[in-house]
């Protein structure tokens, strides 16, 4: 319920209690009984946890992992940040190199793939293929909130400065997307942004090669290499979904750019494309605001503050 509807419900309860107090009391007693029936005290006995069972489950888990593109072997592919966060925690606590490397690969693949919005930030709900290339373009608050926490935790657990910066950029861009598109005047965040705009799925997010050439001019020569603008990567109707085949750091080396220069060039082009894209019909917003999903975002922002010591994240 939003605030208006919730107040309406509360007033209705008050009126019912005034006119039919016995009925309300009977309902309250029934509710209490139902809660008591579902309450289970913690047993005094020690847990029957067995390390062998967990290790067996981990072995079975590893058999389901996609070692080439991250995530699981089945499609469609969902990011499933809670799964990855478990693997990251278990991998670090048990020094399980396989799980640690799998999480790292998955985080790079989804952030470089088409499931990530390379212009305004934020992740789509899932990929329709094994390569994270073609997403279902809907963006959900709960996914992005958990991914903010996950990328923040990954940043805390790396000693590589370039990798840390990569994770940080993804977190900041993703939160920037949520702040700009889903935040309400009251401070809460809305549930989702639709996949469709102007009668087509993904139309807001995709580009033709001719559009990019016209907008980017001389920058197109390197942009097409970084974001795989080639005939064989075209999606449909001459449209391209932006995606990277390598990290920005590796690409920068080929261009003889320093890392700071690479980030500056990409950020400059993103601003240009973002301004052009905002002239299109935007996907509609789901105007519900759910406490549980907002709580996930609060958790993500707390993790990001710990990882990056960004006061704005904590204040938000």
Listing of model-derived features with the role each one plays in the protein:
Residues 1-300, 304-308:
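Replace the tail clause
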Residues 309-316:
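Short, intrinsically disordered, charge-balanced linker/junction segments flanking boundaries
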């Amino acid at each position: 319920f939003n605030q208006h509807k919730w107040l309406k419900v509360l007033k209705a309860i008050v009126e019912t209690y005034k006119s039919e107090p016995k009925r309300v009391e009977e309902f309250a007693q029934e509710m209490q009984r139902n809660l008591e029936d579902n309450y289970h005290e913690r047993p005094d006995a020690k847990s029957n946890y067995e390390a062998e069972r967990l290790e067996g489950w981990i072995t079975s888990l590893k058999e389901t992992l996609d070692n080439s593109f991250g995530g699981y072997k089945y499609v469609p592919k969902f990011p499933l940040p809670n799964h990855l966060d478990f693997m990251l925690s278990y991998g670090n606590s048990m020094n399980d190199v396989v799980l640690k490397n799998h999480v790292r690969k998955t985080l790079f693949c989804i952030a470089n793939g088409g499931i990530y919005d390379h212009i305004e930030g934020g992740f789509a709900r899932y990929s329709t293929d094994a390569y994270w290339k073609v997403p279902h373009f809907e963006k959900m608050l709960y996914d992005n909130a958990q991914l903010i926490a996950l990328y923040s935790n990954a940043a805390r657990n790396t000693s590589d400065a370039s990798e840390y910066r990569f994770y940080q950029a993804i977190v900041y861009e993703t939160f920037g997307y949520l702040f700009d598109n889903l935040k309400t005047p009251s401070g809460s965040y809305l549930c989702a942004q639709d996949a469709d705009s102007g009668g087509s799925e993904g139309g807001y997010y995709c580009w033709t090669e001719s559009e990019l050439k016209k907008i980017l001019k001389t920058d197109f020569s390197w942009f097409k290499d970084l974001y795989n603008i080639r005939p064989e990567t075209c999606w449909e109707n001459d449209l391209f979904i932006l995606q990277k085949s390598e990290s920005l750091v590796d690409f920068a080396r080929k261009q003889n750019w320093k890392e700071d220069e690479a980030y500056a060039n990409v950020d400059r082009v993103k601003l240009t494309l973002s301004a052009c894209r905002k002239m299109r019909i935007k996907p509609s917003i789901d105007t519900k605001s759910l406490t549980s999903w907002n709580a996930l975002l609060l958790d993500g922002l707390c993790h990001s503050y710990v990882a990056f010591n960004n006061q704005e994240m904590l204040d938000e």
